[in-house]
Amino acid sequence: AGARGIIPGFEEYYPYGYRPNGIYIPRFRNVNGDDGVGFTRGYGYQGGANRIGWHELIGRTPGFGAKFKNSLRTPGPWRMSLGGFGEILPYAHNTLRLHKSKKDRFGIPQATFQFEFGNNERRHREDLVEQAVAMLEAAGATDIESYSRPMVGGAAIHEMGTARMGHDPNEAVLNAHNQVHAASNLFVTDGACMSSSSCVNPSLTYMALTARAASYAVEQLQAGAIA
């Protein structure tokens, strides 16, 4: 979900190659408390700009023959796009379980998912579309188009939450050091340990958790607490 629009001017510039990143607009909703916007937590935007190419111009450019083909040599205007990424709250009813009777061809119980979005996520999408349009309007964009595709679980995520951290072994798989409560010499440091990553990319957090867990494991090994 998000919006895009035409940015007038800058026709003397053209992109060559691709940069390794686009632009990012950090979360601004509910940062210092409840903003009264009808939902908790928030969202951020990823985005970028590009000049419209011939593959899009060919369907909107009038003409025929050589004149028409020559007109496609000139790239179209710059277009700015903003795509929103919101947090999915860690609902207890969203689960991953092992099936009680069904097994795969190796005899291992099949994974069974139960997942659905809540009203909080739907409100995120409504608001982030409105705000994307407002930002593009404030930037002077024209021909603004908003979009909100159907919400599909797993379409743009980092999988997490299947072995969450917690102090109580009855409520969590891991302790605060990413160590399995029921197996002291086993550590889990990927996204399974986190029940939410806010609305940002958690990859660096995974790396930090892994470094911390490895350091703790070495300390425990040297102390003879684990083998």
Question: Where are the predicted features?
Answer:
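A glycine-rich dinucleotide-binding beta-alpha-beta segment and adjacent secondary-structure elements
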Residues: P75-I88, H93, I108-N119, R123-S196, ...
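Generic structural motif
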Residues: P8-F10, F28-V31, F85-L89, S101-K103, ...
